[in-house]
């Protein structure tokens, strides 16, 4: 009978946040796969957990996955932990879970801390809908592409960032998204936890005199639907109604459908659009 993979969330700062279920599981499994064994040994020693460990990280995740799957196929139960937070959320775990499913091995997730959710709840920004992007890509072209995609994102946006890249990221956000409300969170769950409720522009000014310290979570206000609608309406007003009609007709819409869509875009009645086109025809 095959073993099972346990995805175990660990504290992001305060050791008291570990769950009883995770503690029991870490003691009972046959092996713990850890992102950094040097870091995780501190957690295990604190809770007097003697289970053997092996490394599983970004640079060995595929090759090591085959080794771990082989052990589970032999009946061993394995727990996966990262340096902090929930496996698979901007940390190793996604590929291992997928490969386990392909191999017919059961996977279960033991919920717990996640910096993105902790920061979101602290932000004071809308929490019902959000877009989690983790770290922006280092590649300039890919980074710019994602920022452009986020420009019209109406959901609350969550990013992770390292201190040495923070100012650059804030400047890029200001350039692409404009000056939005945001919250910057640091040292989450720790004694010196901070949450700056501010704007992108104010943070840029703040870090002109202060040195960024520690990895942080950026929670950024989504774009206002009203603002988008007003911008779109303004863009339609730059073209004639005939040109506007042509756009929709070229997309395959009937003339009747196009008139309805043009009227909606411009805040007009369908009858007004029809009358305008009739008048133009008669000129």
Language-model regions: role of each:
Residues 1-59:
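Glycine-rich, flexible N-terminal cofactor/catalytic loop recognition
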Residues 2, 156, 163-283:
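A contiguous loop/helix-start segment that scaffolds small-molecule binding in enzyme catalytic cores
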Residues 3-5, 74-79, 155-156:
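Loop/turn-to-beta-strand initiation segments
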Residues 54-62, 136-139:
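Conserved helicase motor
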């Amino acid at each position: 009978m095959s073993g099972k993979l346990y995805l175990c969330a660990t504290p992001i700062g305060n050791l008291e946040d570990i769950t009883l279920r995770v503690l029991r599981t870490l003691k009972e499994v046959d092996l713990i796969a850890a992102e950094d064994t040097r870091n995780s040994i501190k957690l295990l020693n604190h809770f007097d957990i003697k289970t053997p460990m092996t490394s599983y990280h970004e640079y060995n995740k595929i090759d090591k996955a085959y080794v771990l799957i082989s052990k589970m196929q032999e009946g061993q139960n394995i727990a996966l932990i990262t340096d902090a937070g929930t496996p698979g959320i901007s940390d190793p775990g996604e590929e291992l879970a997928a490969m386990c499913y392909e191999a017919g091995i059961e996977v279960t997730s033991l919920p717990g801390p996640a910096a993105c959710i902790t920061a979101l709840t602290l932000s004071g920004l809308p929490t019902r809908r959000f877009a989690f992007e983790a770290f922006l890509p280092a590649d300039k072209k890919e980074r710019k592409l994602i920022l452009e995609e986020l420009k019209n994102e109406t959901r609350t946006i969550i990013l992770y960032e390292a201190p040495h890249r923070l100012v650059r990221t804030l400047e890029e956000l200001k350039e692409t998204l404009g000056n939005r409300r945001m919250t910057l969170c640091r040292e989450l769950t720790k004694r010196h936890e901070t949450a700056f409720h501010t704007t992108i522009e104010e943070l840029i000014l703040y870090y002109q005199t202060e040195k960024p310290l520690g990895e942080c979570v950026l929670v950024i206000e989504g774009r206002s639907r009203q603002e988008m609608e007003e911008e779109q309406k303004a863009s339609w007003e730059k073209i004639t109604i005939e040109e506007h009609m042509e756009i929709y007709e070229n997309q395959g819409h009937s003339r009747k459908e196009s008139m309805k869509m043009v009227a909606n875009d411009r805040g007009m009645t369908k009858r007004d659009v029809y009358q305008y086109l009739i008048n133009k025809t008669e000129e």
